[in-house]
Amino acid sequence: MGILGLSKLLYDRSPAAIRERELKNYFGRRIAIDASMTIYQFIIAMKGFQDGQGMELTNEAGEVTSHLNGLFARTLRMVDEGLRPIYVFDGKPPTLKASELQERRQRAEEAQQLFDTAKEEGNDELMEKMSKRTVRVSREQLEEAKKLLQLMGIPVVQAPSEAEAQCAELVKKKKAWAVATEDMDALTFGAPVMLRHLTYSEAKKRPIAEFHLDEILGITGLTMTQFIDLCILLGCDYVPKIPGIGPQKAWEGIKKHGDIETLLQSLDAGRHSVPEGFHYEEARQFFLKPEVTPAEEIEIQFREPDEEGLVKFLVEEKLFNKDRVLKGIQRLRNALTRKTQGRLDQFFTITRPVTKPNTCDAKAGVKRGHSAIALSGTLQQKGSSGHKKVVKK
């Protein structure tokens, strides 16, 4: 879930702290990526619908390969542009998240029931909508993703708990430059720079949103603890939300009272009932001091791709097109060995002007010199991967 309504609130209250960028703007940057969120996006993007049946990207053996296709293609696209992706995987969820996870399971069950009803009624639109709400990333898919990345020579970090918190730790300790995730709570965990839409496909044509925490705090006048309290009131994964407290009231409440304790004392009990389990002190402490592996103990190293291992895994086991895989390996080698010029900010101190965010999008219609798979739309025939959309009965 992340933080409900935080993105819109920041666009309204601190737009100068947000930039709109393109992939090429991160040349030479190490980016810590929320792996589970990214893989979930790939599975959703490649899940289609046709003639009343769900469709998924599979190989000739019928195995779902959406996660591997998306991860392979998008990672290659990033390294082509000079990025250095670091994928961080979730560990054990914190106890505070138990209620949220239970609610997610219930919502998935309800979505499945609605899907079944829509199927009986022949409502294709509702079936497609509900089918995406039932998607879950399996343990097997996560392990396959780790294996693929390691064979590609891309760093993999296993977080002890929340991936966003571990990503923030890497950025705070200068092991990476930014966190890439769709969950806004990366900022709540203290990530100095956060990117949204980094792993979106080119077909979506959405610019990357770059959030700067120091500027957000400076423009809004909030301390980090007040920002955390604001996020808790907006709605997070660790405590239930107070009914009747929306973004505007949460903002005004923290600006006026300074913290949740004082705000709660001012609430009209008849209008706002604080739910049982609103342990905001524990949530606040978890945001301030989450369970992470200290960045100093993590080695980040980009390695030569394992050609033999990739061919065995992707071509022999997962039935990928061999030519596509070999070309991908060469692209990885080119990125690893390329003699690149340093970024200017490695030699000079760059002062970022506080201005209106750059809204320049990438030019549409420009053909790329390499192949990439679209992560949206319906694939009717085999693509360069050798895989195709099949009806899931």
Curated annotation (Swiss-Prot):
GO terms for molecular function: 5'-3' exonuclease activity; 5'-flap endonuclease activity; DNA binding; magnesium ion binding. DNA binds at R74, E162, G235, D237. Binds 2 magnesium ions per subunit. They probably participate in the reaction catalyzed by the enzyme. May bind an additional third magnesium ion after substrate binding. GO terms for cellular component: mitochondrion; nucleolus; nucleoplasm. Keywords: DNA damage, DNA repair, DNA replication, Endonuclease, Exonuclease, Hydrolase, Magnesium, Metal-binding, Mitochondrion, Nuclease, Nucleus, Phosphoprotein. It is an enzyme of class 3 (hydrolase). GO terms for biological process: base-excision repair; DNA replication, removal of RNA primer. Residues 126-257 are annotated as: I-domain. PROSITE patterns: XPG_1, XPG_2. Residues 1-108 are annotated as: N-domain. It is found in: Nucleus, Nucleolus; Nucleus, Nucleoplasm; Mitochondrion. Its EC number is 3.1.-.-. Structure-specific nuclease with 5'-flap endonuclease and 5'-3' exonuclease activities involved in DNA replication and repair. During DNA replication, cleaves the 5'-overhanging flap structure that is generated by displacement synthesis when DNA polymerase encounters the 5'-end of a downstream Okazaki fragment. It enters the flap from the 5'-end and then tracks to cleave the flap base, leaving a nick for ligation. Also involved in the long patch base excision repair (LP-BER) pathway, by cleaving within the apurinic/apyrimidinic (AP) site-terminated flap. Interacts with PCNA. Three molecules of FEN1 bind to one PCNA trimer with each molecule binding to one PCNA monomer. PCNA stimulates the nuclease activity without altering cleavage specificity. Belongs to the XPG/RAD2 endonuclease family. FEN1 subfamily. This is Flap endonuclease 1.
